[in-house]
Structure formats: C-alpha cells, structure tokens
C-alpha cells in the first residue's frame, strides 16, 4: 500500500492493520517514506491516537527494523529499567550494579539528555576512558563478565525509531502517548530483555506534570509491552524536587559513587533505587516477593558488592580501574564554585525542579539541540530538599561553573526556584503507585 494511503487511513480516524504499520515502518527504515510523509503519519497518530493492537504492531515493527540482541547464552535472567526522565535522576548508575550483583544481567541501553532532564549516557561519558558506545562484542563481554553494562543505542538497534524520533522532535508530535510508547519499548525489545520495569516520573521536574498523564503513559507502556510478550511493571515516582542532591554530569557520577560506597545516600534517591531494584528482582524470579527483593537489594548495597560490580563494569568498558576508590582523581571539576544563599528564615516548601534542570543546561551541562556539546564538569551540588530548615544566609545549593558570570546567572535561577515558608511541609510519597498489566 502507498504511504499516503496509510496516512490518509489514520488521518480519517481508522484503525491501521499490523500489515499497514509494518509496511510504513519498513519505508521509514529504507528511506522509501519521505520526511514529510513520516511527519504527516506522526501528526495523524497525534490527533487520532492508536489502540493497544496498533501500538503493539508499531512497537514490534520498529523493533524489527534492526538487530534484536539474543542473550540466551547467559546463565541468568535478563532485565532492565527505563525512566521517563527528571532532574538529579542518576538511579541507573546504582540500580544496574545492584541488580547485577544479585544475579541478574542488565544490558542497559540509555539515552542522552535533552531539554531540562539529564541523560544517563552523558553521565557515563564524564568518566575518562569509558566507552559509552561500544561495539556489540564489547557490550556482550561487559554484560557477561560484570553482569551489567550501561551504553548508548547503537546504529543497528531500532533504526526506525531514531529517524521517526528526530522527525517528531521538530514537528510538535513528541507528546503522543502511542509514539512515546513505541519509541521506548522498541529499543528495549531490541535489547533482548526478559523483563522490564518502568519508572514513570510525575511532578514539576518530569515531562508528565499531572498524575493522570503519568498514569495514562504508564498504563500504555505496561499494556503494550505485555502485548508484545514482555514481562513488565511500572512504578510512578515523584519528581517535584531533584531526586539526588546533585544535578549535572560529573557531579551526579560522584553522587552515585558516594551512594554505592555508603559515603552519602540521599533518602529519596535510596527509596526509588531500592524500590526499582526489588521490582526488577521480582520480575526475574530471583526473589519470590517484593519484600524479599527489597531485603536482598539492600544487603547487596550495604555489603559493597554493588560498588564492586560498578567498578568492574567501568574498568571493562575502558574506564580507570581505581575509579570507585578515587572518583575525584578522574572527574572534571569546574573552576568556579558559588554558594546560592537563602534570603529568609523558614522551611523549603517547594522547588521549581524544571528550573534547576534548566540552570544546569545554562551552565553548559545539558542540551537545547541534539548536537550540542556538553561540559561534564558543571552542575549543582548540595541541593537542599523540601522540608529542610534554613536561615537567611544559609546555602541552598552550590553551583559549579566555568566562570563567575555563569555561576551568578545559574544562582539567580536556583534561588528563585526555591520557595521558603514558615511551616514545614508534609513529606511527599516518593513511590506513589505500582501498575501491572490488566487481566
């Protein structure tokens, strides 16, 4: 069928068959479908949506547009996590080694940051020598030898998604739930997983600010993943403040090393990381209950086995062998430090989390366009959480910048992002809801 006929069919509100969807995505991959046709298709889906069967067919067609990894030779279950993104979200750096040290295999294919949210791959790139985009042979070696590897999407995995996403990004169709769902899941299915846990963020630092939108996305992801044959569950977690007390690249890696080694563990970050670890372990069958998973993940973290696994992963993928012992020796440090100070007494009652992320972007630590270069050394540390008591002159955060002018600009954004009130607010739940496939 001609691409324009498939577009017209969806434009007029009709359901597309699996064959129509496969033919269109085949054209996206081969180049037979033009950018204009792909954009028109995305807009038709944006306005008319897709039902579960259509979204499953789209996901599978995008998965099959490239290679699908096979981990059947591994002597254990294969699992992964996907986060919809936020600020100070360095969970993957602790989660992958925790779950791997418990006996699962975690081939984690991650993305780069765009907009106000940070990207896991950019964080790993802050480690000197670390090969974040290895060939398949080195990727497999790292997973086999250490139990986990955090890498970027290769050219051979879900190439249709890469092209379609670039078109969506410039045509106002990024927010379409079926297209988001297929984009996320096609890459995860191409990674050859046996199970997947989704961390769907909600709040003023997330892409989904409203609970109903986050729930709709979580339900779509869970139902489509299940329809595609993947064991799946989702947690909806809060993003009304940064998850870690650091936001940036090198600073979040340092925060992750401190977490793994026990030097510093931010409470909300620990809650989310261990909840996701328990969920992943239960999904693999390595534990019989969520409680058992939580206990085992906590034990693996506190014993140092997770830190040792992270250290081995970094070394196998080209990073320093002593990185976990001496992160400050290797991580870039910005030349200017600037304390952001409270102007009044009280309690931190709210944080405009998106603005914290945008302050990092303004420092050079994020992207406004996909081809922007990142400075790994800049960022913000010692971010006070909601509920902290402050006095006028106390530090709310510490900005790390390339110049005093950059530091002052970021500090102005950060200080205006903090709301200070007379009463201590009630603590928000960090993990809000668990979503499973229906039936």
Swiss-Prot record:
GO terms for cellular component: cytosol. One of its GO terms (molecular function) is 1,4-alpha-oligoglucan phosphorylase activity. Its EC number is 2.4.2.4. It catalyses: thymidine + phosphate = 2-deoxy-alpha-D-ribose 1-phosphate + thymine. GO terms for biological process: pyrimidine nucleobase metabolic process; thymidine metabolic process. SUPFAM superfamilies: Nucleoside phosphorylase/phosphoribosyltransferase catalytic domain, Nucleoside phosphorylase/phosphoribosyltransferase N-terminal domain, Pyrimidine nucleoside phosphorylase C-terminal domain. Transmembrane segments: none annotated. It comes from the Bacteria. Belongs to the thymidine/pyrimidine-nucleoside phosphorylase family. Homodimer. PANTHER family: THYMIDINE PHOSPHORYLASE. This is Thymidine phosphorylase. It comes from Mesorhizobium japonicum (strain LMG 29417 / CECT 9101 / MAFF 303099).
């Amino acid at each position: 069928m001609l691409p324009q006929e498939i577009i017209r069919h969806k434009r007029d509100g009709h359901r597309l068959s699996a064959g129509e969807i496969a033919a269109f995505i085949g054209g996206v991959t081969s180049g037979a479908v033009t950018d204009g046709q792909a954009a028109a298709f995305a807009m038709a889906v944006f306005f008319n949506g897709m039902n579960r069967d259509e979204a499953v067919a789209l996901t599978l067609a995008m998965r099959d547009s490239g290679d699908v990894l096979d981990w059947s030779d591994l002597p254990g279950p294969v699992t992964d996590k996907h986060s919809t993104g936020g600020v100070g979200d360095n969970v993957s750096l602790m989660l992958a080694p925790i779950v791997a040290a418990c006996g699962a295999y975690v081939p984690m294919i991650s993305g780069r940051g765009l907009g106000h949210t940070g990207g896991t791959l950019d964080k790993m790139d802050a480690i000197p020598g670390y090969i974040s985009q290895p060939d398949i042979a080195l990727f497999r070696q790292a997973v086999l030898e250490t139990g986990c590897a955090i890498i970027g999407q290769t050219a051979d995995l879900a190439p249709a998604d890469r092209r379609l996403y670039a078109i969506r990004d410039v045509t106002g169709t990024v927010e379409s739930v079926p297209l988001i769902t297929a984009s996320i899941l096609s890459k995860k299915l191409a990674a050859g997983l046996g199970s997947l846990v989704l961390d769907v963020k909600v709040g003023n630092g997330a892409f989904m600010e409203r609970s109903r939108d986050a729930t709709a996305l979580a339900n779509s992801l869970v139902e489509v993943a299940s329809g595609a044959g993947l064991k799946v569950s989702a947690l909806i977690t809060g993003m009304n403040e940064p998850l870690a007390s650091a936001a940036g690249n090198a600073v979040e890696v340092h925060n992750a090393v401190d977490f793994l080694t026990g030097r510093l563990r931010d409470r909300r970050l620990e809650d989310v990381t261990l909840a996701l670890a328990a969920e992943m372990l239960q999904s693999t069958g390595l534990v019989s209950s969520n409680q058992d998973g939580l206990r085992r993940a906590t034990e693996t973290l506190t014993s140092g086995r997770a830190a040792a696994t992270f250290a081995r992963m970094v070394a196998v993928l080209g990073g320093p062998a002593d990185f976990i012992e001496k992160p400050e020796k290797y991580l870039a440090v910005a030349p200017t430090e600037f304390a952001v100070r409270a102007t009044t007494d009280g309690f931190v009652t709210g944080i405009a989390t998106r603005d914290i992320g945008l302050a990092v972007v303004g420092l050079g630590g994020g992207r406004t366009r996909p081809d922007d270069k990142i400075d790994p050394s800049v960022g913000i540390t010692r971010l006070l959480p909601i509920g902290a008591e402050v006095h006028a002159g106390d530090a709310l955060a510490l900005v790390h910048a390339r110049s005093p002018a950059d530091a002052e600009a970021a500090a102005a954004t950060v200080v205006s992002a903090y709301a200070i009130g007379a009463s201590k607010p009630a603590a928000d739940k960090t993990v809000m809801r668990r979503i499973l496939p229906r039936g």
